């Protein structure tokens, strides 16, 4: 048996998924109604799959497979998040600072215990909520609700692409044993992020055929006209958090693999 220990909290895993979902590239030709209906169906299926995995992962015969798969998947997501954050830094701020900061982030992620990520995650969630409120305030005057009633907005021809993150399936490895079956709802965060972005693009531009940054650039409130830089900085801060968290997740999976190996030897 793997030794029981305190793991990552729900706010930590939720912030990681939310940050990744906001960075997903928008699909063209997806209507708000199609995103809501089809996206909800896919989120429900992913929730069921997550529940099945949470019930089966502790089987001794499969623990090695779960641990290897989780480690490889978290490493892949770590690489992807670094590339996304660096692209934003270079395109929007003409900066390579993230590359210089990366060794420190990886070191911090490896050293900080799972319980140490809860407090910063809760603080960042307040910044995320504040940023969302500021964004809605600046875009409210540009939204045209009639756009939701057009033929393109109500068609259901295409299914949206719902990303699959390692946190959906391997949260039992990260959450410890204190919150059993409590995080199968993580796919709904991705659904809410994608549905909100699609609806916002349709309300402002009439179609969801533009990059997400265009929605931020459309923000205006008399004196300030480039609030997108501040909102992007909030996302970058969350991305830096996710980079450290994914490194900590890899460390946690590695530790559990070592414990599992020792238990098998005994």
Regions found by a protein language model. Give the residues of each.
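Hydrophobic, membrane-embedded alpha-helices of multi-pass small-molecule transporters
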Residues: 5-24, 38-46, 69-81, 98, ...
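Hydrophobic, small-residue-rich membrane helices and short re-entrant helix-turn-helix hairpins
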Residues: 29-30, 112-124, 170-192, 254-260
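Membrane-interface loop-to-helix entry segments
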Residues: 62, 96-101, 106-139
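Membrane-interface interhelical connector segments
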Residues: 204-228
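Long, low-complexity C-terminal extensions of enzymes
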Residues: 262-266
